[in-house]
Amino acid sequence: MDDRGFVRWLQGLEAQGHEIVIHGYFHERPRRDGEKVGEKFLTRFYTEDEGEFYDLDYDEAFRRITLARDEFAKAGITPRGFVAPAWLLGSAAERAAAAAEMEYTTRLTGVRDLRFGDNFHARTLTYSVRNGWRRTASLAWNGVLARHLAGALLARVSIHPPDLNHLEIWRQILRLTDRLVEDRMATTYRDWIAERRTRRGV
C-alpha cells in the first residue's frame, strides 16, 4: 500500500476499535466469452463486474487473499475477516480464505465462521443506487426487511460510499440504524464471532 496517508487513516481506525477486513484485491472480475445467462446476471446485472471471487480457483484466490493479508501486516494492520466483493464467494475461494487464516466471511444472507464452519443466518440491509429504479426498490425492500429483522439476533447494515450521495438513502440508513440499536449493542464481526465461540465452549 503506497498511499501513506490512507495507511495512517486505517491504522488510526483500527486503534480506535474499528475492524479492518480484506474486501477482495482488485474488486473486479473481467468478462469472459461463453458465460452462461446466470453468470452474466450475477456478475454484470447484480453487480458491475465486481464478482472478483465468484469463480476464482483455489490457488489464485489464496494468492490474492494472502497478498492482501501480508500487505496489511507490513502496515501493522491485522485483518481477521474476508468479505468478497458483492458477497460473491465461490466454494474454492472460501476454502482459500480459511487456509489464509481468515476467521470469518460474510454473504448477503449471513456470517460464516471459517475456522469451525458454523453459519449464522443474518440478512443484511444493503442498497443498490446505480439508477433511480434501484434506489426506489432498495428503499422499499429495506423498509420491509428492517421490520422483519426486528427480533433477529444479529442485524447488519452494509453501507457503501455511493450511498452517501443520495439523501433519501442516507436518511433511511440513519433512521433504520437508530431503530436497530435501540435494543442491540454495536459490535464487530471479529468480536461477535468470538462471542459465539465462547458460548459453544471453544
What do these predicted regions represent?
Residues 1-6, 28-30, 83-92, 130-138, ...:
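Acidic-and-aromatic substrate-binding clefts and catalytic sites of carbohydrate-active enzymes
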